[in-house]
Amino acid sequence: MEPILAPNPNRFVIFPIQYHDIWNMYKKAEASFWTVEEVDISKDINDWNKLTPDEKYFIKHVLAFFAASDGIVNENLAERFCTEVQITEARCFYGFQMAIENIHSEMYSLLIDTYVKDSNEKNYLFNAIETMPCVKKKADWAQKWIHDSAGYGERLIAFAAVEGIFFSGSFASIFWLKKRGLMPGLTFSNELISRDEGLHCDFACLMFKHLLHPPSEETVRFIITNAVSIEQEFLTVALPVKLIGMNCEMMKTYIEFVADRLISELGFKKIYNVTNPFDFMENISLEGKTNFFEKRVGEYQKMGVMSQEDNHFSLDVDF
């Protein structure tokens, strides 16, 4: 039995802190709380009306995937991780993660509601798990892992792949729109959400390091490469990024680059050994690393939650 999963009679009381690294992650999550009301999407409609039909199609489908996926992540947290993990510090993090995933889902739903006026099309997008085969494939993979009989360690990797790999290409595609100066509300919310998901991914890596009997490197590689191929197909075949003027081969490479960052953070050898083909993603990740806890708006932080000495925190995964 893993210590973090062993019955813990002290789980109802937070102090004394036993796992300081996990507690620090919780405090970082707490410091970065935000709400949809902080994002101004009023200026997006002008840009939206100027987009080509292909660009609109792409954005709507990406938002439809995102709107559903946060709910799947939360179902896993509620049904599995929150009941399995017995240490208080991790339960604090998971509880906070559930709250912020709800905010992500609300944000994506609000964006769809703002951009799409036709009620039938809205329903189609809000029910993407049933209505869109390309979204259903990713959702099915994630849902399969909620109910899988595999141990906590394997499922931890699978959901790190969901948040670290399944979201990566879509985040990059929205940052591409930012590079073009389009859709300030969408791109600002994307910054906030990608930052949150980076922290969730880092937390999964931290929990993995607390396992005494983690899954084998072979198992980890299998799960990650599986997620990579599904994400590559999603953004180069089902919903090709060429619709918004991005290069599909570069997107494939970018997803491999992200997967290498994740598997390295888990303590294993890289699989693909590729460099980041998107210079604009390098700049964004560096910005986030240097300013993460210095500004409230854009690089948000609740005042006074974190002390000054914690300002050096950097995201190990690119979002």
Curated annotation (Swiss-Prot):
Q: Which GO terms describe its molecular function?
A: metal ion binding; ribonucleoside-diphosphate reductase activity, thioredoxin disulfide as acceptor
Q: Would you identify the family this protein belongs to, as annotated?
A: Belongs to the ribonucleoside diphosphate reductase small chain family.
What does the note under cofactor report? Binds 2 iron ions per subunit.
The species this protein belongs to is Monkeypox virus
Q: Which InterPro entries match?
A: Ferritin-like_SF, RNR-like, RNR_small, RNR_small_AS, RNR_small_fam
- Intrachain S-S bonds: none
Assigned EC number: 1.17.4.1
The name this protein goes by in its record = Ribonucleoside-diphosphate reductase small chain
Keyword annotations = Deoxyribonucleotide synthesis, Early protein, Iron, Metal-binding, Oxidoreductase
